[in-house]
Amino acid sequence: VLKKGLFEHGFFDVICCFHTLDHIIDLESFIIEIKSLLNKNGQIFFIVHDTNGLSVKLLGEKSPIFDVEHIFLFNKKSLNKFLKKNGFSNTRVFSILNTYPLFYWLKIFPIPNILKTQLIKIFELSKLGYIPFSLRAGNIGVVASKRQKE
C-alpha cells in the first residue's frame, strides 16, 4: 500500500506497478504521489490489461479484464494520454508477451467444462500441457520518464 510520507520525495529512480493501476480508486492522486516519489530523472514501468488485446477480441465482455475489481481500463492510446496529461514524457507503450504452459491457457479459456476436462486428460497423457506457449494475450506495458519542469 502506498501511503503519503512513507518515502521522501525524489527517493526512487524507478517505480514499477504490475496490474495495479486498474484497481486504484483515486488514480489521479496515486499518479501524482508516484511522480513526487521519483527523482528528477525517474522512470516508471507499469503493466495493465489492454482493452484492445487478444482476450477482448476473442471473448468480448467475457474477457477476464472486465471485472468489478478493475475500476480503470486502458488501451495503448488511453494509457499514453493519461501519463502525458500527468507529467510524464518519453512514453513507450508496448504489448506484453505472456508465456505459460498450455495447461494454464486451457484452464483459463472459457470453454464448456466437459470439453475442458477431456482436453486436460489428453494434455496430461501426452505431456502437451507442460509445453510453454507464448501469446500476446492482452497486457500492455509502459515505460515513461518524469517530465522535467520547464
Residue ranges and their predicted role:
Residues 88:
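Short phosphate-binding/catalytic loops that engage adenosine nucleotides
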Residues 32-36, 63, 105:
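Residues in and immediately flanking transmembrane alpha helices
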Residues 62-74:
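Short, contiguous acidic/charged loop-to-helix segments that flank catalytic cores in large enzymes
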Residues 60-63, 134-135:
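Short, flexible turn/loop "capping" segments at secondary-structure junctions
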Residues 1-58, 73-85, 138-149:
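Conserved SAM-binding loop
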Residues 59-60, 107:
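A generic structural signal for secondary-structure junctions
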Residues 92-150:
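A C-terminal cap/extension of S-adenosyl-L-methionine-dependent methyltransferases
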